Amino acid sequence: MVNNEIKLRGKVLRAYVNDDGHLVVTLAVLHPHYVDGVNIGSESVFRCVMADRKRSESLDVLEGDSLEVEGYLRLDRHLSVSGREHKNLTVYMEAAHVCA
C-alpha cells in the first residue's frame, strides 16, 4: 500500500492558524519533489496543514520564510451546499522547520 510520504522545501506564500487551531501554509516549491521516492515534478504550490495542534502552536512561520516539511499527501473530498463534489490535494505535515 502506498502511504504517500512527501518531503518538501519551499517558500511560504501564506501562513495562518485555522479555526480548529491547526497551522495552514501555502508553500511554493521550486525544486524536484518526491512522493514515496518517485519524482512528481517541480514548480508546484501545495496547501499544507499541520496535523498536530500542539506543534502548530510551537512553530513560528511567516510569509517569505523558507520551510522544510515532512508529511503525507491526501486527497480530501467534500460536498458543497449545492451538492457538487470538491477535491483538494493536501499535505498533512508531521514535521516542519524554518530553514536559515
Positions of predicted regions on the chain:
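Single-stranded nucleic acid-binding surfaces, predominantly the OB-fold ssDNA-binding core
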Residues: 1-100
